[in-house]
């Protein structure tokens, strides 16, 4: 008998202070890759009040104005209103950058070095990464995080278009879905907190967002008289963004991935070039898992990788289909090894990652986005046929 339970996931909009920092970090990364595809970038950002600090390690031939890129990132989010202390044109920017450590560089470069196990390009660090896919939604993502992102994306559209003039950039969404086994059947609760101007009343915020946002995004058949709507439950959200909370790059890793339903290795994505397996191997894991599900070989699939710094081969690769596999799991794992290559250099090549594509990934999830498959290559299902053939 299938078990009924509720699973919740949250998302944040691009105006959330942590996402402001993720956006800045990925703007800096793309600025490097635009001029030098072989740039090595690890860029962190902190935002508080009307101050932004960027720091990290960059080895690149790219030349650009860091401060201008920071302001451009903030402007794209929409922090240009006079009623917000944090502002693209007036914020103070502090930059503290150095080059990548020579010790790390020799491990990652495609060269021989004393004490290095191989001359091939190695992983940029040790660590473990996960990829996940399931058949709950057309984009093969878990329903709670998928709809939390869709609410956030539409909320931002309503703000930027001017359709709801009292909206401001900072917001969070949370969706609780009731399941019967692995099948989502109804929405138990929607939580939405959005920054707003001081002159709008709570009653208008609640009514507007339920009618114009939630009911237009969530499947009507999943909403019922028992669905709970918690809209700005503190009663006021005027102070937001970095004015209200300090933001730091890399603090929304569960929002960025699978909303807690698929596991996470702990490494953040934003501000890191693809030699960092925290990012590139996580993208690879999604590509593998999505193609397994798209091929009909499982209803759910999770892939785990582990790497050692400077080493070209993964230490381990494992596959779990949660008892939903249509073929023997050992056979599936062999097929995955035959179809995909997990060396860091090959991941970069297969997914075409040495391009300035990363600011497209920053907000509303790095996975489940099918609006730009040319950039987000890990969302393609172009290996499903090869996998089916490999297990035949």
Predicted regions and their residues:
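A short glycine-rich, hydrophobically flanked beta-strand micro-motif that places a catalytic Asp/Glu
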Residues: 39-43, 171-177, 227-231, 297-308
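N-terminal, positively charged regions that mediate nucleic acid binding
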Residues: 1-42, 48, 379
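Alpha-helical support elements that line or immediately flank enzyme active sites
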Residues: 14-33, 136-153, 272-296
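Conserved phosphate/anionic-ligand binding catalytic regions in large, soluble enzymes, centered on
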Residues: 10-12, 16-21, 121-137, 238-263, ...
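Glycine-rich, mobile lid/loop segments that gate access to catalytic sites or pores
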Residues: 8, 68, 75-239, 363, ...
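Short, charge-patterned binding micro-sites
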Residues: 41-60, 309-313
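Glycine-rich anion/phosphate-binding loop at the beta-strand->alpha-helix junction
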Residues: 200-294
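Internal helix-turn-beta structural module
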Residues: 48, 300, 308-392
């Amino acid at each position: 008998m299938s078990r009924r339970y509720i699973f919740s996931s949250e998302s944040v909009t691009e105006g959330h202070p942590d996402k402001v920092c993720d956006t800045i970090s990925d703007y800096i990364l793309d600025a490097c890759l635009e001029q030098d595809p072989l740039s090595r970038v690890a860029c962190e950002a902190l935002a508080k009040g009307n101050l932004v600090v960027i720091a990290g390690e960059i080895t690149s031939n790219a030349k650009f104005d860091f401060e201008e890129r920071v302001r451009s990132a903030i402007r794209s989010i929409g922090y240009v209103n006079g009623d917000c202390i944090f502002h693209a044109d007036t914020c103070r920017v502090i930059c503290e950058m150095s080059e990548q450590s020579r010790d790390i560089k020799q491990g990652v470069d495609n060269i021989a070095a004393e004490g290095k196990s191989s001359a091939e390009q190695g992983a940029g660090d040790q660590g473990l990464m996960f990829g996940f896919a399931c058949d709950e939604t057309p984009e093969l993502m878990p329903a709670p995080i998928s709809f939390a992102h869709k609410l956030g994306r539409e909320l931002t559209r309503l703000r930027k278009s001017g359709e709801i003039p009292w909206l401001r950039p900072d917001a969070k969404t949370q969706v609780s879905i009731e399941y019967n086994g692995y099948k989502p059947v109804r929405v138990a609760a929607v939580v939405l907190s959005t920054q707003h101007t001081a002159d709008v009343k709570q009653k208008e915020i609640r009514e507007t967002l339920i009618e114009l946002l939630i009911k237009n995004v969530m499947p009507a058949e999943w909403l019922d008289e028992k669905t709970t709507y918690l809209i700005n439950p503190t009663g006021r959200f005027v102070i937001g963004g970095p004015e209200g909370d300090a933001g730091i790059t890399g603090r929304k890793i569960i929002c960025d991935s699978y909303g807690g339903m698929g596991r996470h290795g702990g490494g953040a994505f934003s501000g890191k070039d693809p030699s960092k397996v925290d990012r590139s191997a996580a993208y690879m894991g999604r590509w593998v898992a999505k193609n397994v599900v798209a091929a009909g070989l499982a209803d759910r699939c999770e892939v785990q990788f582990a790497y050692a710094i400077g080493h070209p081969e993964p230490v381990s690769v494992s596959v779990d289909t949660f008892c939903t596999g249509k073929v023997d799991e050992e056979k599936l794992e062999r097929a995955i090894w035959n179809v995909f290559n997990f060396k860091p250099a090959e991941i970069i090549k297969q997914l075409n990652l040495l391009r300035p594509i990363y600011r497209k990934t920053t907000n509303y999830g790095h996975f489940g986005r099918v609006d730009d498959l040319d950039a987000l290559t890990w969302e393609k299902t172009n290996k499903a046929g090869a996998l089916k053939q490999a297990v035949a």
